[in-house]
Amino acid sequence: MFVSTAFAQTATESQPASTAGEHGAADAVHTETGVAHDAGHGSGVFPPFDSTHYASQVLWLAITFGLFYLFLSRVVLPRIGGVIETRRDRIAQDLEQAARLKQDADNAIAAYEQELAQARSKAASIAEAAREKGKGEADAERASAEAVLESKLKEAEERIAAIKAKAMSDVGNIAEETTATIVEQLLGLTADKASVSEAVKAIRASNA
């Protein structure tokens, strides 16, 4: 088949025009798609509420929770546990000391009762002798003996009260320090000593 020169030239000239038309149509389609795509983005939902992002949000939530849990278990909780354990040991030691002081007080009471019994026995013997020496002299000796007994009784009571007060004061101070430390470790706040003291006193009064 023979192709004339004029036909070949016409075909060559028409090919670029056809190509240009195809490119123009493609650009038009791309432009329309881009407009539609932008319109779709403009009317989209808020990203945190977009269901396509749920997986990544759950993943980051799990990672954040895991890091927070590690921080609590490795840093915060061991420190709080150490403080509580130290305070617990100190309270146990102070309670043991308070028990010893109470034992000393009981021993002092027993000694006082023994001395009182001896004094009463002596007073009885003095009274018996007074019947022979005279009523006046017996009354004087009895008054002297009773004064000595009263003095010893008062001294013993003051000693017992001081021992008990010291023991309760030590326990109260330890409770206040422990409460203030726990508040500082858990809440990161500096506890008011007056408020802590009032709270501890209120608890002790309710348990009394």
From Swiss-Prot:
Residues 1-18 have a biased composition (Polar residues). GO terms for molecular function: proton-transporting ATP synthase activity, rotational mechanism; proton-transporting ATPase activity, rotational mechanism. One of its GO terms (cellular component) is plasma membrane. Residues 1-26 are annotated as: Disordered. Keywords: ATP synthesis, Cell inner membrane, Cell membrane, CF(0), Hydrogen ion transport, Ion transport, Membrane, Transmembrane, Transmembrane helix, Transport. InterPro entries: ATP_synth_b/b'su_bac/chlpt (IPR002146), ATP_synthase_B_chain (IPR050059). Disulfide bonds: none annotated. The chain crosses the membrane at residues 56-78. It is found in: Cell inner membrane. The keyword Cytoplasm does not apply. It is a single-pass membrane protein. F-type ATPases have 2 components, F(1) - the catalytic core - and F(0) - the membrane proton channel. F(1) has five subunits: alpha(3), beta(3), gamma(1), delta(1), epsilon(1). F(0) has three main subunits: a(1), b(2) and c(10-14). The alpha and beta chains form an alternating ring which encloses part of the gamma chain. F(1) is attached to F(0) by a central stalk formed by the gamma and epsilon chains, while a peripheral stalk is formed by the delta and b chains. F(1)F(0) ATP synthase produces ATP from ADP in the presence of a proton or sodium gradient. F-type ATPases consist of two structural domains, F(1) containing the extramembraneous catalytic core and F(0) containing the membrane proton channel, linked together by a central stalk and a peripheral stalk. During catalysis, ATP synthesis in the catalytic domain of F(1) is coupled via a rotary mechanism of the central stalk subunits to proton translocation. Component of the F(0) channel, it forms part of the peripheral stalk, linking F(1) to F(0). Belongs to the ATPase B chain family. This is ATP synthase subunit b 1. The gene is atpF1.
